[in-house]
A protein has these predicted regions:
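Non-catalytic, well-ordered alpha-helical scaffold segments
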Residues: 25, 53, 240-243
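Charged, often Cys/His-bearing segments associated with DNA-binding zinc-finger transcription factors
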Residues: 1-42
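Glycine/charged-rich beta-loop-alpha catalytic/anionic-binding loops adjacent to active sites
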Residues: 37-38, 51, 201-203
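A cross-family signal for key residues in well-ordered alpha-helices
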Residues: 28, 56-57, 161
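Short, amphipathic alpha-helical "recognition" segments used to contact nucleic acids or chromatin
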Residues: 48-62
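Short, well-ordered secondary-structure "scaffold" segments embedded in the functional core
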Residues: 68, 72-256
Length: 256
């Protein structure tokens, strides 16, 4: 059974990973160092690590079913499933533990439509979704933390606390939108009751705040080009692993 897609053909790398061949090579080297390609007991993998990483990225990028995707790599559906189960978690973004002095982070939530109703709930878009809290660095726009998914009907305040995103950033300054009221994060000023408009200095603060916060929205827009985040059919931790892996690939793309 011969496949069509392989990482040995550089032309396949960018469409499915968003990375240049050089960036992809860095990812493979880092993955090996992190233990993503251990010596297995029993039957060895039928694909080299490079092709397995490409398979996982292609799955996230295209959202093809495994029956559709597996033949493109010359493997069975069950083999492709094992590759994704093994490598999905191994490609995850590692939460940053320390931040530079005076760092400013941005948090926002995004809803990922998901078919596994055991981990989802109907949200404002009337679809079953999970709420993912993503934290990015305001200067570099790199993702630094991704919270565990919660049912999509949880608001930003709850999700910030319960997803683990709050614990991941410690006491670092974090800005957010008005949905995070009462969390201690830096949010926009609101009009006081009985006042028609905000003082000029508060309006200026809000304008600046909005421009910085837009960087998170742009990061989400780039991440949502991965089709798995528009209609996810993973069960269990699959959606979380996909979000973490896509965040890592997003960072590699930006870092150059």
């Amino acid at each position: 059974m011969s496949g069509v897609l392989t990482a040995s053909g550089p032309s396949w790398i960018a469409p499915f990973t968003g990375l240049s061949p050089r960036q992809f090579s860095k990812l493979i080297t880092a993955s090996r160092r992190e233990g993503a390609d251990p010596v297995r007991k029993g039957r060895p993998w039928s694909l080299p690590l490079e092709d397995r990483v490409l398979l996982v990225a292609a799955y996230w990028q295209t959202n093809l079913t495994l029956r559709q995707l597996a033949p493109l790599f010359g493997v069975s559906k069950s083999a492709a499933d094992r590759v994704i189960d093994h490598l999905g978690p191994a490609l995850a973004l590692q939460t940053r533990r320390r931040f530079r002095k005076n760092a400013v982070l941005i948090v926002d939530g995004t809803l990922v439509p998901i078919r596994a109703h055991t981990v989802a709930a109907q949200s404002k878009n009337y679809r079953y979704s999970t709420n993912h809290q993503v934290v990015i660095d305001a200067d570099s726009c790199l993702a630094v933390a991704v919270g565990r998914p919660l049912p999509g009907n949880r608001n930003g305040c709850e999700a910030w606390e319960l997803s683990g995103a709050k614990d991941a950033v410690g006491h670092t300054t974090v800005i957010a939108d008005g949905g995070y009221r009462g969390t201690g994060l830096v949010i926009p000023h609101r009009r006081e009751r009985g006042r028609a408009e905000l003082p000029a200095w508060k309006e200026e603060h809000n304008t600046s705040h909005r421009k910085v916060r837009a960087r998170a929205e742009h990061a989400f827009a780039r991440m949502k080009t991965w089709k798995i985040l528009r209609d996810c059919h993973f069960k269990g931790d699959g959606a979380h692993h996909a979000m973490l892996g896509i965040a890592r690939l997003h960072n590699l793309t930006l870092a150059g």
